[in-house]
Amino acid sequence: MKLAKYQPTLSLKPTQFSLGVVEVEYKVKKMMKMSRHQLKKFIDEHPIPIVISPWKELCITDHHHFIFACWHANVKKVRVEIVKDFSNSKLSYVQFWKQMAKLNYAYLIDQFGNGPQSPLYLPSDIRGMADDPYRSLAWIVRKEGAYEKNKASFSEFVWSNFFRKKNLLSKQGKHGLKKVVGKAITLAKSAEAANLPGYISPKKLQAVIDQSAERTDYIPKDEKTGPLATAPTLKSDLKKSKTKT
């Protein structure tokens, strides 16, 4: 199926239920500082991988945080790159999503760590994605250097579910992130995390902790640097974004 290089941001269908709002906010601030030329170049350098479904839906397989940030930064169109085209396929709905799961093109665990859920409940566009504070925590812990970025599929969701099982955030949600980053980093270097993607051995990780010795729970005291401190406040929250047209 022939497809224009640039597609409307809201024409793309998510293949996961949730994301981490803190990471989105961080990306939005970065993008808002760019000139129009810089932003165009940045978007061109970060094409959105998509799968075309038998029903001609453009399904995002990665970079959900990036495209959500694009929408909040008022980017109307993004560059896309087709990784699989099922537009001429006779696969049924169930068969298609089984294939998507087999190829690691879909992540059907919801924002509470439950699933896999039916793809019928996936949002029609990125405005309907839910916030998972544990996904934000996993991203912050990686930004702090407690585990390495890697090519494993959905690795930060693996880490988020690891932290979720420890009930670190309880009912605090996003607002409790600063309080638990230190505990999360300690868990990330423990033997319990040894089989998780991007795990760093305790000896190597000690260097990261030594470099962060001046921080309280590995978060800057002056709140002028670091992922949480530099994240701006979005003009509208996720609940409002679901109803925005």
Question: Which positions does each model-derived feature cover?
Answer:
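Surface-exposed, charge/polar-rich loops and edge strands
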Residues: 1-57, 71-245
